[in-house]
């Protein structure tokens, strides 16, 4: 992704996060959150695309949010971004590291239905 200043940004996902997304597709389909496997794939793809696009934008605008100390077990100097679909009760949180001001590595992802979400402070 290229920002308005011409700088290239790169967002990558750790192997653990990639595995989580593949498992999420199966879970969403098996638990009948989606009636068709392709719908579950599309939903997960939407989450991935959102974070690939928005994480660099947030950083460029100086709106990156520092992750709470609890999440530092997943990496040093973590930031996080949130995604919520319109009319959805689920918010996804991606925790990421920043390298060289233009590389972003998503190292952990959760949603508001997990126990870990209790550690997210919303006024940061």
What name fits each language-model region?
Residues 2-4, 82-124:
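Enriched for short, Lys/Arg-rich terminal
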Residues 1-85:
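Basic, Lys/Arg-enriched alpha-helical interface segments
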